[in-house]
Amino acid sequence: MEPSVVPSWQELFGELVVLDLASPYVYLGRLVERQGDFLLLSDADAHDLRDTQTTREKYVLASRGHGINPNRRWAWVSLREVVGVSRLDDVIGD
């Protein structure tokens, strides 16, 4: 698979994104802005993977296929916890 044009991370503002955290949480939502040491998401799904039997990858793939189910109007996520950021549309399934 050949990569398409690689965006700069600032181009992710306004996009639906996946934030993988060091903890067993994954956040999905629209990346609005950076506020100091936090990323602000709107219409966010804050998902604690300890609450389900599914894996992080399966949960994100399901969200890509069926859409995000927001449980937060706004979510401020600490950059210290974020280990990865990607557009939801860039998630690759089997």
Enumerate the predicted regions with their spans.
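Conserved RNA-binding domains used in RNP assembly and mRNA/RNA metabolism
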Residues: 1-94
